Each structure stands twice: as C-alpha cells, then as structure tokens.
A protein has these predicted regions:
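Transmembrane alpha-helical segments of polytopic membrane transport and secretion proteins
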Residues: 1-16, 83-90, 282-363, 438, ...
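Membrane-water interface segments at the C-terminal ends of transmembrane alpha-helices
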Residues: 8-38, 48-178, 211-232, 236-238, ...
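Short, membrane-interfacial amphipathic segments enriched in basic
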Residues: 40-46, 387-396
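Alpha-helical transmembrane segments and their immediate interhelical/interface regions
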Residues: 52-80, 177-198, 278-308, 343
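Short hydrophobic faces within alpha-helices
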Residues: 96, 185-196, 264, 409, ...
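Short helix-to-coil transition segments within interhelical loops
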Residues: 180-212, 500, 506-527
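Glycine-rich helix-loop "coupling/hinge" segments at transmembrane-helix boundaries
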Residues: 230-259, 388-389, 546-574, 607-609
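Helix-loop-helix hairpin linking two adjacent transmembrane segments in secondary transporters
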Residues: 257-269
Length: 625
C-alpha cells in the first residue's frame, strides 16, 4: 500500500471514529426525546389545555419579532459601518458582547428598565427640578405602576433577545466577510454595480446583502430556534400569565405527575414542529426567492433603454442583461482583480458607509456598557430607597456570598474549560480528517443541538444520562456541556478552515514536508486566532447552559447561571447581580485571553530567514525548513 493511500485510509478511519463518538450520544438523545413524545393521551391533553393556544401564540410572536429585529439590526449595522473604521471598532467590541450570557444580559437589562431601576431613577432625577419649578404636582416618591419587565405583551423579552442576538449575527457575518474568496467576489460585484449607476448604499443592499444573507441562513435559523424555545430568559423577562410554551413545557416536565410530564414532552415536540415548519419556509423562500431578487435588482430592464451613471455616461440595457446573466450563473466569482490594482472609488472599503448610521454601533455598544455597569454596580448596592439615584450604602456582602459558594464557581469554571477544550479538539480533528462529502452529509446531525428546542434537547440528554448511568455526576454534565458547545465551536471554525489557502500545503509538500508538519508548523499557527476564538465561544456557551445543568445534574451541581436564575425569583437583588456579573466576567476573561493569544506578532528574523522582499513561496520555504 502506498503512503498516500495509507494516509487517506487513516484519515477516513479517524473521521469515522469521530463521527461515531459524536453521533452515538446525539442520536441516542434524539431517540429518547422521540420516545418521550409518543404518548397520544398527552397530545389530547395538550390540545385541551386552556393555556396551550395563548402560550404558543406568545412563543411565536416574541420569537419571530426578536429574530426579525435582530436580523434587521444586523443588516443596518453592516450597511452603515462595513468597510469603515466604525466596523473595525465594532469588531473589537464583539468579543465582550458575546461573552455576556443571555441570562446575565437579561438580568442587567431588567436592573436598568425595571420600575425601580436605574433609568427610572435617572428620569426622576431629571424631572424633579421641573416638577418643583412648574408646580406640576407629579408623585415621584414611588415607582411607576407600569410593567416594564415581565409585561403581558412580551416586549421586555423581545428587547432582551433582539439586543443579545445582534452581536452573534454580526460575528457570523464577519466570519463570512473575512474569507478571502467572499471578500474578493463581493468587492468585484460592488464595483461592477456602481459602474452601472447604482449608489454605494444601493449596491450594498442589492448585491452584497442578498448573498451574505444566504450565507447567514444557518446562524439566522439558530437565532430563530433559540428565540422560540428559550426558557431561562423567558423566566426572567417574559410574561408569566400565561408564560411562553417553552416555559410551560419546562414546568410540566418538572412536575412529578407522569401525565403532566408527558404533556411537557408533547409541548416540546409541538415547538419542534413549529421550528421545523419555519425552517422549511425559510429554505423555500431562499430557493424560490432568488430569481425574484435578481429580477428586482435589474427591474426596469424591459423599459429602460439606458441607465445614466454619475459621470454622465450611458450603460446599455445589454450590459444590464449581461450582468444579470453573470450574477445568476456565478460568473462574477471567477473574475480576478488585476495584480497591484488600487481600490476603486466604488470599493466597499470607501463608499459603503458614508454619513448616516454611525449612531447604530454606538447605541449597541452603549446598551451593553450600561448593562455591564448595572450588573457591577448592582452587585455592591446596599440600602437603596426610591427615588434616590445612588444607594445610601455600598457593600461587598454579595461578593462575599459568591466567594463562600466556591463549589459553584469551580464547577462553572471546570465544566466550561473541559467542555470547550473537548469541543475544539473534536472540531479540529473533524475538519482535518473528514472528507468534504462527509462533512456535508453529517452537517445536519452536527447542528442538531442548534435546531432542537432547548427543552426537548435537555429532555433527551437527561434520558441519555439515565440510560448510561451518568445522571447526577460530573461526567454526565461534562458530556452534556460538550455536546451543547460543539455546534457553536464548529460553526466558528468552519469559516476560517474553509477560507484557508490550500496552495500553502502544496508548497510545503513540494519542499518535502509531511502534511502533519505543515499543519503543526504553518496551518495551526496561522489559524491560532480562530482556534482561540472558538475556544472562547465554547467556554461562553458552557457557562450559559441552564436546562442541561438542571436536568443532567439532577440538582446536585450549581453553576453561576442556575444560581442567578434561581435568585431572580427572590428579593436578593445584589446577590442576583453578583452571580450574573460572574456569568459575564468569566467568559470576558477567556475572550480577552483568546484575543491576546490570537494577536498579530512580529518576530525577529532568525538565522537563515528569508529576506523581507522574498516571495511568498520563498518565505514559506524558509519557514518549513
């Protein structure tokens, strides 16, 4: 057997073992969840329950509204900031935003907008002088009677979910836009669109955004699934009479009555059916809407004989027809810019975002800064009567209580480190060993935790832990957190791996270096920023896990998330804020370390190094030797 055939067989064997190691628990969990929802009597009881219809409607309304607002906010921020210094600054702030878990963000936002929160107190402080001066007679000594949190319309829940998902979609978009092949194609097509008379903003919306939206289908569906099925955030910010169907299913699954338990499984599967229907509708819209989008892009083609450009030149309709044909056939992707060509006046780096829109990135950053400040200040608040702007006393009692809960802190930290490390190792091994055809075929299975409702996924993990005898111990929790973090880690690594220049491996092979020497000396060092970022993403996902920790841990293990959500139902505001701040500080620290590890470095040339003006091949030759 030749060495190349032996290497290929080894890679296939390793990929098969990796697929089996992941597929077995995933499929087992799915099968357990399927069996839990086969009780016909539970479906009848679910249909007859008076809260089912209203809870389902609330789930649909809040989930769809939050997802639509998050997508619209992402699109506007990209249109107004991509290719400008604002985009670079926004990218630098994304790790801190992503590090803030959903539950911690919800708690911080509630501390801001609650009837006795910071914003109301600030408003009272501003209105009080006017009230005394004008003699308005406003009663400002008690919190207002309106509901800004857990309101019956779900507005607080929508605000939390929309604001929290925008950074995730921006991060997913940045991963696509930073791929050399995607950036090159969009730059060329935007230039061509502007030569045909479209403004920079119009070219972005007609050319770049439709293509980017198609590449963001998986992240958008993940946002939709999460918004429709979230439990911990709905418990904190959502209405309670009735709650969302996800919360109702969780409450029934917590019940000791087997009939109620079966109703909870049926409700979880009802959510799964709704999610599947919406995902199918999105796929159909993407498939059948492409032709309509292209036709709308070149609307007026039959009527207009010429299109006037800014310079006053004319472009014939035959050029527009050629452009439409090239776009539909993907011919523009095969165009290559001339070597050494300077960016044109119409390149996205200079004309996409001029003038308006700068407030969007600033408002998003300000919102996250205010939430973080509310968490930190809220954790040291003592006596704080309304309407005082500042508390009468500051205290560290909440942080002393956190320090006394050392097992909770160490469990949170240990689980996050172990599960994110395992997820990164598996994802790297899979991307290195699995053939592209295998990756495409198993993509649906790998992303299963992203598309299943969180209640249903936690139910399957619990049944898996019971069957394998790992219920209520740290091994079961590690497996559950790893399976939850893995899809996000894989999603963050696929873009950098897919955009890696494969020609570098050919150059290394021509210099007599093995594939593993190339991977160890060239590929992984070049991808260290992506690897560090994916580890940080997995860490943050593990810290944020609520339902898997409750179900698989059987209540024996507490984490910062479970403690913060549990304290939200009580009156210990400072202790709740302290655990929520801990939820944020741990991932923020890891994201900071990841940014430091992935930073660009400059090393002094060693003996025999290539000269600065050497070609890329000569530099690679000196690197691998």
């Amino acid at each position: 057997m030749s060495p190349s055939v032996s290497t290929l067989a080894s890679k296939h064997l390793a990929a098969a073992l990796l697929a089996a190691a992941l597929g077995l628990p995933l499929l087992w969990s799915l099968a357990a969840a399927v069996l839990a929802g086969l009780d016909a009597a539970a479906w009848v009881a679910l249909a007859a329950h008076p809260q089912t219809a209203s809870a389902l409607w609330l789930n649909l309304y809040t989930g769809l509204a939050a997802s639509a607002l998050a997508l619209a906010g992402t699109a506007l921020l990209l249109a107004h900031s991509f290719g400008t210094p604002r985009w670079t600054r926004l990218l630098g702030r994304l790790p801190a935003m992503l590090a803030l878990p959903h539950a911690a963000f919800a708690i911080g936002l509630l501390l801001l907008i609650a009837p006795s929160g910071w914003l109301v107190r600030l408003g009272v402080a501003l209105v009080t002088p006017l009230n005394a001066w004008l003699g308005l007679g406003l009663a400002l000594d008690a919190p207002p009677a309106w509901q800004s949190t857990q309101d019956p319309w779900g507005l607080g829940l929508i605000a939390v979910l929309a604001l929290k998902e925008i950074p995730f979609l921006l991060w997913a978009a940045a991963a696509q836009l930073q791929r050399p092949d995607v950036a090159r194609r969009l730059t060329l097509e935007l230039r061509l669109a502007q030569t045909l008379g479209y403004s920079a903003r119009s070219a972005w919306w007609r050319v770049a955004w439709p293509q980017l939206l198609a590449r963001l289908l998986a992240p958008v569906l993940a946002v939709l699934v999460y918004s429709l099925t979230v439990v911990d955030v709905a418990l904190l910010a959502g209405p309670s009479t009735p709650p969302t169907l996800a919360v109702l299913a969780w409450q029934w699954l917590q019940d000791a009555d087997p009939e109620r338990n079966a109703m909870g499984a049926a409700a979880a599967w009802l959510l799964a059916a709704v999610v599947a229907a919406l995902a199918l509708a999105a796929l159909l819209a993407q498939h059948y809407g492409r032709g309509w989008a292209v036709a709308r892009w070149t609307r007026g083609l039959a009527r207009a004989r010429t299109v006037e450009t800014r310079a006053g030149t004319a472009v014939s309709t035959s050029s527009l027809a050629s452009m439409k044909t090239a776009t539909e056939g993907g011919a523009l992707a095969r165009v290559r810019p001339e070597a050494g060509a300077a960016p044109s006046r119409g390149s996205p780096s200079k004309t996409i975002a001029k003038g308006s829109g700068s407030w969007g990135a600033g408002a998003l950053s300000l919102a996250y800064a205010a939430v973080a400040a509310a968490l930190v200040l809220g954790s040291v608040i003592g006596v704080w009567p309304f309407p005082d702007m500042w508390p009468q006393a500051w205290t560290w009692q909440a942080w002393h209580a956190v320090a006394d809960s050392a097992p909770v802190v160490w469990t949170t930290l240990g689980l996050a480190l172990a599960s994110s490390a395992a997820a990164v190792l598996w994802a790297v091994a899979w991307l290195e060993c699995a053939p592209p055809a295998w990756q495409r075929r198993l993509q649906g299975l790998l992303y299963l935790p992203l598309v299943l409702p969180s209640v249903l996924w936690a139910l399957g993990l619990h049944r898996l832990a019971l069957a394998w005898g790992i219920d209520g111990n740290i091994k079961g929790l590690w497996l559950a957190h790893t399976l939850c973090a893995l899809p996000y880690v894989l999603l963050s690594l696929q873009g950098p791996y897919g955009g890696f220049d494969a020609r570098l491996q050919a150059v290394a092979a021509s210099l007599g270096r093995t594939r593993w020497a190339f991977v160890w000396r060239i590929k992984w060092p070049l991808l260290r920023a992506a690897l560090a970022a994916s580890f940080a993403v997995g860490f943050a996902v593990s810290v944020a896990q609520y339902l898997p920790t409750l179900y698989v841990g059987a209540g024996r293990f507490g984490t910062a998330t479970t403690e913060a959500v549990a304290l939200a139902a009580g009156g210990q505001r400072s202790l709740m804020a302290a655990f929520a701040a801990l939820q944020w500080l741990l991932p923020a620290l890891v994201f900071g370390l990841a940014a430091w590890a992935g930073r660009a470095r400059r090393f002094a040339p060693h003996a025999g190094a290539a000269p600065p003006d050497a070609t890329a091949g000569e530099k690679l030759s000196h690197t691998v030797q």
